[in-house]
C-alpha cells in the first residue's frame, strides 16, 4: 500500500472517530424508541380507575404543583383558556406562574453560580427553558407550556419519580415535564447547562441545542447510559397518544407557538421534505469524496514526492530569518552599548568640534587599486 494512501486512510479514520465522539448521543437518539421507559396504559388508565378495590394505587411521588412561565402576568388571549382549564381541573394543586422578574430573583437567591450564564443568554426563550429545569429540581411538580391546555386531571403522572414526553421525529421534549425535588436527572440537567451554552449562529439551532428539546434529549441519553435509572432515579416517557389528540390524552395544543421564529419555520419545511434533504446530503457527500480523490492524487504527484526537499527548504528559510533577526538585534545592542575596547578602537572625526566615535573603514589602496597591484 502506498504511503500516501495510508496517510489518507488514517486521516479519514481520525475524522470519523472525532465525528462519532461528538455526535454519539444524537446518533443513538435515532434508534431509541423510548419503549423501555414508556408510561404504560395500565399506569395511566387503570381498570375501573385508581379507586378500584381490584387495583392497588401506587403512592404519589411528585408534589401537586403546576409551574408555567411567561414574561409578565399578562397572558396572551390564545393561551388564557388552556391555562384556566388546568387551574380549574386541579383546585387542590398549587399553581405558580413564573415571570421573568421572579425567575431572575429565584436564580440570584438560590443558584447564584448560574446567574451570569442565565442573564447572558441571547434569546429570552433560553431563560424560559433554563428556569423550568431549576424549579423542577428545586420544588418538584409538573411544568406545562402555556400553549398546552389540560384535558384531564394529571394525578396518574404523579405516581413516577420523573417524566418527560416523547417528541417527533425522535428524542424527548421539554414542554411538559414532571419531577420530584432534587431528582438526579434534573440535577444533571442544570449542571449541564453551562457546558451546552453555545452559539450555533442559527437561532433555532442555538435554542434547541443550548436549552431546548435537543439539549434535554442529549442529556437524557447520557443519563440513561451512565446513571442508575432504577427505582427513584427512573425517568418515564409519556407517549404521543397519551400526550394529545386521543380520548384519554392529558393535553391539547393551542394555536400560536411561544417562541418559533422564521428560521424555525424553515426547519419545519425541511422536515416536510425529507427526500430532498437526503438527495442534497448525497450530493454533498459526493463532493467530499471527490475532494478526497483530488487530495490523494496530489499526494501521489511529483511535487509531494519531493516533500523532504520542501520541508528542508522551509526549515532553512525559517532558520535564516531567525538568524537575521538575532544578528540585527545583537548589532543594534552593540551600537547602543559598545564595550570600552570597541569604543577606543573606533576612529575620531577630524573636526575639532566633534569627537563622536565612528567606524573607520579605509580601503587598502596598495592591495585594491589596480595602479599599485599591477606588477608588470
Curated annotation (Swiss-Prot):
Assembly and oligomerization:
Heterodimer of CSH1 and CSG2.
Record-level Gene Ontology MF annotations: inositol phosphorylceramide mannosyltransferase activity; mannosyltransferase activity
| Annotated stretches, region: Disordered | 331-351
Q: Name one GO biological process term.
A: mannosyl diphosphorylinositol ceramide metabolic process
Q: Name one GO cellular component term.
A: fungal-type vacuole
Q: Which principal EC class is assigned to this enzyme?
A: transferase
Q: Where are the transmembrane segments?
A: 7-27, 274-294
Q: Which InterPro entries match?
A: Glycosyltransferase_domain, GlycoTrfase_DXD_sugar-bd_CS, Nucleotide-diphossugar_trans
The organism's superkingdom is given as Eukaryota
Report how it sits in the membrane.
Multi-pass membrane protein
> What is the designated name of this protein?
Mannosyl phosphorylinositol ceramide synthase CSH1
Q: What else is known?
A: Present with 195 molecules/cell in log phase SD medium.
Q: Write the lineage as a comma-separated list.
A: Eukaryota, Fungi, Dikarya, Ascomycota, Saccharomycotina
Q: What happens when the gene is disrupted?
A: Exhibits a reduction in the synthesis of mannosylated sphingolipids.
- Keywords on this record? Membrane, Phosphoprotein, Transferase, Transmembrane, Transmembrane helix, Vacuole
Modified residues annotated as Phosphoserine in this record: 354
Q: Which EC numbers does the record give?
A: 2.4.1.370
The catalytic activity, as recorded, is: a 1D-myo-inositol-1-phospho-N-[(R)-2-hydroxy-very-long-chain fatty acyl]-(R)-4-hydroxysphingoid base + GDP-alpha-D-mannose = an alpha-D-mannosyl-(1<->6)-1D-myo-inositol-1-phospho-N-[(R)-2-hydroxy-very-long-chain fatty acyl]-(R)-4-hydroxysphingoid base + GDP + H(+)
Q: What role is this protein assigned?
A: Involved in the synthesis of mannosyl phosphorylinositol ceramide. Catalyzes the addition of mannosyl to phosphorylinositol ceramide.
* Entry's family note: Belongs to the glycosyltransferase 32 family.
What does the UniProt entry say about where the protein is found? Vacuole membrane
Amino acid at each position: 500500500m502506498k504511503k500516501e494512501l495510508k496517510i489518507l486512510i488514517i486521516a479519514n479514520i481520525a475524522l470519523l472517530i472525532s465525528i462519532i465522539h461528538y455526535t454519539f448521543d444524537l446518533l443513538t437518539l435515532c434508534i431509541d424508541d423510548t419503549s423501555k421507559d414508556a408510561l404504560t396504559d395500565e399506569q395511566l388508565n387503570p381498570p375501573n380507575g385508581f379507586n378500584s378495590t381490584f387495583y392497588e394505587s401506587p403512592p404519589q411521588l411528585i408534589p401537586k404543583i403546576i409551574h408555567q412561565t411567561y414574561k409578565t402576568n399578562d397572558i396572551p388571549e390564545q393561551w388564557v383558556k388552556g391555562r384556566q382549564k388546568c387551574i380549574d381541573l386541579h383546585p387542590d394543586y398549587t399553581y405558580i406562574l413564573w415571570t421573568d422578574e421572579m425567575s431572575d430573583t429565584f436564580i440570584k437567591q438560590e443558584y447564584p453560580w448560574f446567574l451570569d450564564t442565565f442573564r447572558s443568554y441571547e434569546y429570552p426563550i433560553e431563560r424560559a427553558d433554563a428556569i423550568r429545569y431549576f424549579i423542577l429540581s428545586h420544588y418538584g411538580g409538573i411544568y406545562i407550556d402555556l400553549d398546552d391546555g389540560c384535558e384531564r386531571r394529571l394525578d396518574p403522572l404523579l405516581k413516577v419519580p420523573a417524566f418527560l414526553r416523547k417528541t417527533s421525529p425522535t428524542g424527548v421534549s421539554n414542554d411538559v415535564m414532571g419531577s420530584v425535588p432534587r431528582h438526579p436527572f434534573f440535577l444533571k440537567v442544570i449542571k449541564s447547562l453551562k457546558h451546552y451554552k453555545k452559539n450555533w449562529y442559527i437561532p433555532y439551532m442555538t435554542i434547541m441545542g443550548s436549552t431546548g428539546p435537543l439539549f434535554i434529549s442529549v442529556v437524557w441519553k447520557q443519563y440513561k447510559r451512565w446513571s442508575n435509572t432504577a427505582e427513584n432515579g427512573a425517568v418515564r416517557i409519556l407517549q404521543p397518544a397519551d400526550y394529545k389528540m386521543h380520548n384519554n390524552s392529558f393535553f391539547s395544543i393551542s394555536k400560536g407557538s411561544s417562541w418559533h421564529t422564521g428560521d424555525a419555520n424553515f426547519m419545519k419545511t425541511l422536515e416536510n421534505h425529507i427526500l430532498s434533504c437526503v438527495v442534497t446530503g448525497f450530493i454533498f457527500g459526493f463532493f467530499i469524496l471527490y475532494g478526497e480523490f483530488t487530495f490523494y492524487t496530489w499526494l501521489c504527484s511529483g511535487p509531494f514526492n519531493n516533500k523532504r526537499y520542501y520541508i528542508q527548504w522551509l526549515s532553512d528559510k525559517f532558520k535564516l530569518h531567525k538568524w537575521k533577526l538575532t544578528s540585527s538585534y545583537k548589532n543594534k545592542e552593540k551600537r547602543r552599548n559598545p564595550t570600552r575596547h570597541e569604543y577606543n578602537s573606533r576612529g575620531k572625526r577630524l573636526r575639532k568640534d566633534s569627537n563622536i566615535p565612528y567606524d573607520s573603514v579605509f580601503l587598502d589602496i596598495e592591495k585594491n587599486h589596480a595602479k599599485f597591484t599591477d606588477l608588470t
